[in-house]
Amino acid sequence: MSVKIRLKRMGSKKRPFYRIVVADSRAPRDGRFITSVGTYNPLTTPKEVKFDEDAVMEWLQKGAQPSDTVRNMLQAAGVMKKYHEAKYAKK
């Protein structure tokens, strides 16, 4: 089972709101998911991104692959740098 960290669209027509979820890669975009790890609101200024950093790190260490958009959000927040340092730290 390939697991992805991606956006699930919510909200109403023309007023999108997204949840950052961990889901099976075969599941539909707005379908079943394993767990929700954050939210993204593109309508606010500046755009509002909230997520549970510990949960995201845990899923990345388990092998979950972030989508391109989520990867950019995690890089902006510094999570990908922490993950990379933890993964390749000298033991």
Swiss-Prot record:
Keywords: Ribonucleoprotein, Ribosomal protein. The keyword Ribonucleoprotein applies. Gene3D superfamilies: 3.30.1320.10. GO terms for molecular function: structural constituent of ribosome. It comes from the Bacteria. One of its GO terms (cellular component) is small ribosomal subunit. One of its GO terms (biological process) is translation. Coiled coil: none annotated. Belongs to the bacterial ribosomal protein bS16 family. NCBIfam families: S16. PANTHER family: 30S RIBOSOMAL PROTEIN S16, SMALL RIBOSOMAL SUBUNIT PROTEIN BS16M. This is Small ribosomal subunit protein bS16. It comes from Limosilactobacillus reuteri (strain DSM 20016). The gene is rpsP.
